């Protein structure tokens, strides 16, 4: 008897509140649809961004981390929207999320600035893995660009780790960006040397050197009158990968040609005058 009464009461409630009931069920269904669509959108967006970053040769660690941020941002927005559809007040939830974000941001201010700088570095592509650079006064080859720092390998094999925010706020010198590098050396000769003859000899050496870029200007000029020498500035453009070896070979060839023409490279001389006094 009681069971029939309860069923009858439920039936009467549904009959009296069927519009509200249908609206509530509709909101639940809409909420579920939003969750499904939002989840699918997060996956698709993550995949698109990841493929884009792979094509741009962006570091895999950066791309995965950035994709995770996009994914969870979409999911949080989806969940909040879904809860709002079923009548839950989302204002307080948004306030809590905002407060938590501010607290985390203040606690991780340095790390977040490093991360933001890292994103800028890989996006703007100031340098790539393997480039020879000067970052914050440190010279070496780029080993990796990570989320919070960049690793550089120096000539003597040291691994230097530099925070990304320091890199982005200082001068970046990339020696690998251009195809050619400027070779610059100083050649010193005796004061008795014929200036015109010295310049002709050096220019002839540079013109015969196949690794010197002929399309660019060659410079040989008297730069300084030293304490015991005439100092000539010698400039020429070479391919960046051959800079060291070419510079060494050019110096050797110039020395040989100067010797052939009996033009000496001086060394510093010190005159010592000794004064003697007669003993009384």
From Swiss-Prot:
Protein task: Mechanosensitive channel that participates in the regulation of osmotic pressure changes within the cell, opening in response to stretch forces in the membrane lipid bilayer, without the need for other proteins. Contributes to normal resistance to hypoosmotic shock. Forms an ion channel of 1.0 nanosiemens conductance with a slight preference for anions.
Presence of keyword Cell cycle: no
Topological domain spans for side Periplasmic: 1-27, 86-87
Topology term for the membrane: Multi-pass membrane protein
Residues in compartment: Cytoplasmic: 50-64, 109-280
Molecular function in Gene Ontology: mechanosensitive monoatomic ion channel activity
Compartments (UniProt record): Cell inner membrane
Protein name stated in the entry: Small-conductance mechanosensitive channel
One Pfam short name: MS_channel_1st
Keyword Membrane part of the UniProt annotation: yes
Similarity comment: Belongs to the MscS (TC 1.A.23) family.
InterPro entries documented for this protein: LSM_dom_sf, MS_channel_1st, MS_channel_C, MSC_TM_helix, MscS_archaea/bacteria_type, MscS_beta-dom_sf, MscS_channel_2nd, MscS_channel_C_sf
Sequence intervals crossing the membrane: 28-49, 65-85, 88-108
GO CC terms of this entry: plasma membrane
Superkingdom of the source species: Bacteria
